[in-house]
Design a protein with these regions (language model features):
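Alpha/beta-hydrolase superfamily serine-hydrolase fold, recognizing
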Residues: 23-303
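Sec/Tat signal peptide C-region and signal peptidase I cleavage site
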Residues: 18-22
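Positively charged n-region of N-terminal signal peptides that target proteins for export
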Residues: 1-4
Length: 303
């Protein structure tokens, strides 16, 4: 009954979601394909904060043999909206590759302001480290991915060191290392979005009226943590993105180059904030697969 309820929730999320695919028969068909062909363990509580249970879903091929590479996915929505259920089609290509997927929800701004979402994402990664063996997860081949605010969270989760103190809600001794980060048009410099020509209402809403918001914004900005030794990072963005300034990801990859971090920046010419064509998506996923192959991440376990 629990899984049936989850399937219905997922289908409803697609039906009311913002993406055109979510409103189409194709979207429903793909949602049913996921439910029919993959084992889904839904709504596992990985953290309780602000009297709110943060949950995640684990997806696996029904005939999975492990341990296998695993994608940890964070949905978008400007840190103030969105849901994990409405994002499931985004990571379908990884399921088709035989990967496990961990689909994470986190505290939105209406529950708790920044840096809550960043803290939650770090706790989700720690949960995977502690529980992954129960789901055939190869913790040596963890890849973080997200779009927009989720891209930001994928970056912060893979870049923020323990010394930053942002994992205080789930302390532990595990070194939270990941094999790669896939950033779809994520926010790189939160401070830049709080004032000036690139101000964005969603960033202001996430930081609220806190007196130290500039300090918090810097603490949760991926650009703050660029340094030697980071995992390889691939970013994807349209150069006509009206929601997240394209220049932010240009700056990120310039900084990664300067730090000697393996990286790749895939630009979609004329692309907006997602909504890329099928042909563009095919090219992007070919680039992602090639990038992961170079890191020796994509292969499945032979066990």
């Amino acid at each position: 009954m629990r899984k049936l309820g989850f399937a219905i929730t997922m289908l409803v999320a697609f039906a009311v979601g913002p993406a055109p695919l979510a409103q189409s028969a194709e979207g429903f068909a793909k949602a049913l394909h996921i439910y029919d062909n993959y084992r889904v363990v839904p709504n596992i509580t990985y953290l309780t904060a602000n009297n709110w249970d943060a949950k995640l879903d684990v997806y696996q091929a029904r005939d999975a043999k492990g341990p296998n590479p695993t994608l940890i996915y964070f949905h978008g929505g400007g840190w103030v909206q969105g849901s994990k259920e409405a994002a499931s089609l985004t990571f379908l290509p990884f399921l088709e590759m035989g990967w496990n997927v961990v689909n994470v929800e986190y505290r939105l701004g209406k529950v708790s302001l920044a840096p809550a979402a960043v803290q939650d994402a770090l706790c989700a990664l720690r949960w995977v480290y502690r529980n992954g063996k129960d789901y055939n997860v190869d913790t040596g081949r963890l890849v973080l991915m997200g779009n927009s605010a989720g891209g930001h969270l994928a970056l912060t989760t893979g870049m923020i060191p323990a010394s930053a103190g942002l994992d205080s809600l789930c302390p532990g001794t595990e070194e939270l290392k990941v094999a790669a980060i896939i950033n779809w048009y994520g926010i790189i410099d939160v401070n830049e979005l709080l004032a000036g020509p690139n101000v964005r209402n969603y960033a202001i809403a996430w930081l609220g009226g806190m007196s130290n918001r500039d300090e918090i914004a810097k603490r949760v900005s991926p650009l703050t943590y660029v340094r030697t030794g980071l995992p390889p990072i691939i970013s994807i963005q349209g150069d006509a993105d009206p929601t997240v300034p394209y220049s932010q990801n240009v700056r990120l990859h310039q900084a990664l180059d300067n730090a000697g971090v393996g990286n790749m920046f895939v630009t979609v010419p004329g692309g907006k904030h997602g909504g890329f064509s099928d042909a563009e998506m095919a090219k992007v996923y070919a680039e992602i697969r090639g990038f992961l192959d170079k890191q020796n991440i994509a292969r499945l376990s032979a066990n």
